[in-house]
Amino acid sequence: MTNITALLLKHQQKFPHGIWLILSLFILGFASNGQPVQAKTPGQTQPVSAAVKESQMSLRQRLRQSRTANGVSQSIPTGVTLPSNTPTELRNLLTQMDRAASQGDIKGVMQLYGPNFTHGDGLNAQSLEKSLLALWKRYPQLRYSTQLQSWKAEGNVIVAETVTNITGLPSANSNNLALNATITSRQRIQGGKIVNQTILSERSLITSGNKPPQININLPQQVRVGQEYTFDAIVQEPLGDDFLLGTAIEEPVEVSKYLNPTSVDLELLTSGGLFKVGRAPSTPGNRWVSAVILRGGGMTMVTQRLQVVR
C-alpha cells in the first residue's frame, strides 16, 4: 500500500507551505473527539469515515459553538432581521445578544441565558460559555447575521426560530482558515432570557489556501433509524496533475465533542471526490457528517447535521 506521507514529500511542490502547516499542526473545523468509524465505498453499508490509515491530522475545536451563538468581532457590524410584529421582549433580546457578542462580551451574552439553560445537544450555561470563549479566541473576526423566521407565544414563553449566518475571514489566529456557517435553531424564551435551544439544521464550510476545492455535498437532512443513506462530496474542478486527499467523518453530536480534538486519516482519492454509503444507527439522535478534501491549491471541510428519527 502506498505510503501517503512519502508520496506527499515526493511531490511537495504541489502543496504550498500553508497547507503543510495545517497538516502538521491542526485544522480548526466543525470536528471533534471521536473514535474513527468505518468508511466504505458504495455497495457497502457501514457508518461513514476514514477507510485507510495513512496520514493523520487533527481536527480541533469543533466550531459547533457557533450554532449556539454569537461569535463576532467588535470591528464588524452585526445584522438582525426582525419582522415588524416582533414582541418587544424578543426584539430586545436579539438586539442585546448581537451587541454583546459583537464586542466579545461574554458576560453580556451569558446574562441573556437563564441559569438553568438547556440545549438539545446537552449543553448547559457553563459548557456554552466555555465553547464561546474558545470560538472567539480562535476566530476573532466573525461576521454574524441573524434572521427571525417565526415566533409564537406559549403562555408566558416565546418560541422563536432563527437562522444564523456566520462568516469568518482568514486571520493569523485561525491559521488563515475562512469560515462560513448557517445554523437554524429554535429558542424558548422566558422572562427575557433563553431557557432552551434546539438545533434544527446546520451546515458549515471551512476553507484554506489560494484555491480550495469547490465541493458539492449530497446528504439527506433526515433519515430513519437503520436506514441506508449515501454521502457524496464531489469536487467540481478538473484535477489536472493535482493529488487529491480526503476522508469522511461521521460521529454522534455530544457535548464532549465540542472542544476535544479528533484524529482522522486521509486517503488518496482515485476519483473526483468522496462517495460513501452509511447506515443510520438503531437509536434516534443527531450526527455530524463531514468531508475533508485537500489538493495542491488548498483545503475544504464541509460539515452537515444529519437527524436520525424513528
Language-model features, listed with the residues they occupy:
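Short, low-complexity N-terminal intrinsically disordered segments enriched in polar/charged residues
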Residues: 36-99, 103
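Short beta-strand edge/turn micro-motifs at domain boundaries
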Residues: 40, 45, 177-213
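Short, well-ordered alpha-helical segments enriched in acidic and aromatic residues
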Residues: 101-120, 126
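Surface-exposed, charged secondary-structure patches
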Residues: 133-177, 181
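Low-complexity, intrinsically disordered terminal/linker segments enriched in charged
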Residues: 195-249
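Short, aromatic- and glycine-rich surface loops/edge beta-strands on solvent-exposed regions
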Residues: 233, 277-297
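Aromatic sugar-binding surface patches on proteins
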Residues: 267-276
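Edge beta-strands of extracellular beta-sandwich domains
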Residues: 299-309
